[in-house]
Amino acid sequence: MAKVLKFTACAAAVAVALYAGAGYVCVPYATRTVLEKVVSQELGREVTLSDVSFNPWTLVYELKGLSIPEAGSDPLLRLDLLRVDASIQTLFKLAPVIEEVTIDGLRINAVMNEKNRRDVERLLGKSGTSEKSDGAAAEKKSEASSGLPQFAVYNISVTNSSLSYRDDAQKINQALTDLTLRLPFVSTMESASESLVTPELAFKLNGSQIEATGSTKPFGTTLEARLNFKVSALDVAELARIVPALNSDNLRVADAKLSSNLTFVFRNPTGGNPAKMLLSGTTSLANVSVTQKESPIVTLPKAELNLNELDLVDQRAVVENLTLTGLRLDVRNSKAGINLLAAAESAAGGTEKAKPEAKTEAAPAASSSASPWTWKVVAASLRDANISWTDSTLSPAAKITVANLDASVKNLSSDAEKAGSFSVSAELLGGRIESSGTAQISPLAVSAAAKGTRLSLNAVAPYITKALGADVRAGIAFDVKADLKGSDAAASGTATLNDFTLKEGKSTLASFKTATLKLNSVDTAKRSADVALVSLASPVVNAVMTKSGINFAKLAGSGSESKTQTEAKPSSKAEASAPAWSWKVAQASVTNGTLNYRDESISPVGTASIPKLNLTVKNLSSAKGSLGTVDFSSGLGGGSLNAAGKFGISPVAADIEVKGSKIGLKPFSGLMTGYAGIGAKSGTFDASGRMKLASQKEKTIAGWKGDLSLSTLDLTNSKGTGLMSWKKASLTGLEVETTEPIHLVVAKAEIDQPAQKQVAAVKEIAGIASLISSLTGKDKTAQKIEKYSEKIPDKITLENVRYENGKFSAEGVSAASVGGILLNKLSEAMSEKLGGSSSATSTTK
């Protein structure tokens, strides 16, 4: 046992000796090696050191007489004394705890000349390389950390110190002298030690004395020290010139005055209460001016911050009030980019590509870690702000101004159970917008009402012209309510477009007086939409067909590329499995519309116009089997066309009564001549019946049951020569269904010929047959009729006409008669259209 104890004692003695040797010898030696060799080599200057010591038993480290020379000037750096007294609590708390830090006689004399500038760039370059190599480690550290690191530093003292910076090229000469700073502690730990040091701060800035008064409260329930810091109209612009990122052509702080009245509270841990380091007070900036290439991009006459409390230990912040008054932003976009982005890049220290990439990669890690900071903004406001946007990449340049912008936030916080309120108003696009509501940051939730009046698209017309290749002008108004919870959104309200015009050059493509949308609700979570009203008043559409296509195709084609790219993106599994949207429209209407069509691709040019278009649809929805009502009317060819009935979407179904009255063919003669080579001097079309749509075996079947008639017809060829005419042709009891095979029945077909001689009658009938023949490319039918010697009656009547088995038939009509020949011709034409046999013949029943 004695030997064991002796061995243990010897081992302990050796360990103590090694520890003492490491402390007394190794630490000073390592310090000298780093400063006198490594730092000297990096800076290209001989670093000297008078003395350095470390007591391993008291953990006191002292460095004396550190000097870094500067050619032709005072030393770059001199430090008379650095004393650091570490606490043994560092080992138990696994975080640095420093009992005392004393800095005496620190003098930094930075002179920026060409040589020093190159040295700085070289050192920064090495620093950038080091940052890249340590990127993975930094990312892991970012993931692990969730707030401020744990540390505590007590009894801080800085005396007899100064800092000067001179750059003759930039005309900078700043000096901070006679610096004295005493702080009881700076800590993010609840408790570690106590300090009764009275806080103090005093220095001269360019000869102007600045002081902060301190006090100590050593008795009572708390041991507390305070430091009150006051400054009035400090020229921040002069100080900002020292920072290269804030003193370049892209970004320069031209003017700013800082005033502060801040109180630092250092509360020692007593009576079981944790240590606190608190900051409160007011700070303001006045006459802020930020320029880019000598032009102001940001001006801020006044900014005020009233900080209720900032607790670095509990990591809690309460802002009583933040006010920005008279903010002006001049944002410009040119071929070189957006000026504010260039300024932001300059403020960030450059535009190196590696840095954004590193930030992009680290972003997910940062977002994945929840910050422990809690905060609250009791009130914040933006008053009388103006933002101007000029985009010179367009011709003409786009100019948009947000004027008289007022915004306020109240009781916004990190508390997930409490929502704050906000309001915003501004003059925009020639009108005014207003919004107010409640907001919650985490998780994101917003409930707001927004209203816009007398807004105009004129200011954004250059963007619309670039996107569509056409000019759009319109007025806008809206009054909506919206709720946002995470990725789900719901909205309701009204929106109106008025005095809308769409022009290409001097030609108006479309216009309308008013378009209104009244939305009861749309909910992305429920995937439902309930529309109360969609209305379009006095729309006019001017469609023009040319050899290069219809005029509207250019507008559709302008977004084809982006549309194709969008369609090419595969839908996610969630989207594919999501239920279909349900929707309903209480009423949709078009009133007093006009459709004008002009075809310049044919000769002669053909035109047509459909005026007095009116359409009303009610109670249309996606519900299976539901039917809404439809009511349509329009002028057509000097007459009218009306339709009314029921219509459904799922499945497609319709039962609509149709009536066409006195619809003239002459207004469409130009188009008829251009498309078919046949025009019309006269002709009136009438129709009365019922149209139906029904779904059968995933196919939509269309049907018609009613009467058709064509009166006072006079057809001509392209040269104006008459082809045929009749008093009246009618189909009574016409039934058609697009089944397979097609169902077609005519109870009675009549053609009332003009009162003429037999030869003339034969020619008229031959003309009818010739018309059919010319449309199908065959002429023998006309020859057969011309050879027919039987007297042709003035009126041709066919009863019970049917189309069955690929051929037409009628009661009492022989194949050799004029009626039979016409039916045979129609059978051939119908068979060719339906892809059937062309050898069909008529039969007599």
What does each model-identified segment do?
Residues 47-51:
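A short linear hydrophobic-aromatic micro-motif
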